[in-house]
Regions:
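An N-terminally biased module of ancient metal coordination in phosphate/nucleic-acid-related enzymes
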Residues: 1-70, 75-79
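Active-site gating/metal-coordination segments in enzymes
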Residues: 63-64, 71-148
Length: 148
């Protein structure tokens, strides 16, 4: 991936899983965005095993990765998807000293979403929450986030 070894240990705070299982949930029209716009390597975009992900992390000295279970927009709207928490929980089991889970938040879910967040923390050992407010066309301090 790179010829230059990073000597500084890194914690990557927002990591999207690229496993085949996780990619099944993403809309198929994202290829151009990931590969052309943000220059994701084609091999990475096509999917990695957990072990392949750990190998890439080793290559650039990423010691820990906070894996997000994103909630991209409200379900039912075009382009929206939610990655089930269980998929991230399964990844954490592969290397719990390096993978940590962040539960995606959908502010339109209200108290049901709060209960899901609580379950992710208590049952799956997630360490926190993650949100993309722009996918909901809300500011981060919108009142819909208050229950969380």
């Amino acid at each position: 991936m790179t010829d230059k070894k990073n000597l500084i240990p890194v914690i990557d705070a927002v990591v999207n899983l690229q496993t085949a299982e996780a990619l099944e949930f993403r809309p198929s029209d994202r290829r151009e965005f990931y590969i052309e716009k943000i220059k994701v390597d084609t091999d990475v975009f096509e999917g990695l095993t957990h072990e392949g992900m750990l190998a890439l992390m080793d290559e650039v000295n990423i010691q820990k990765a906070f894996l997000i279970a994103p909630k991209i927009g409200q379900l039912g709207l075009q382009g929206s998807y939610h990655l089930p928490y269980e998929i991230v929980a399964d990844a954490i089991k592969v290397d719990p000293n390096r993978f940590y889970g962040l539960a995606g938040i959908d502010p339109t879910e209200g108290m049901e979403g709060v209960r899901s967040l609580e379950r992710a923390i208590k049952e799956f050992g997630f360490i926190g929450a993650h949100s993309y407010p722009h996918w909901f066309e809300l500011s981060p301090d919108d009142r819909k986030y208050y229950p969380f």
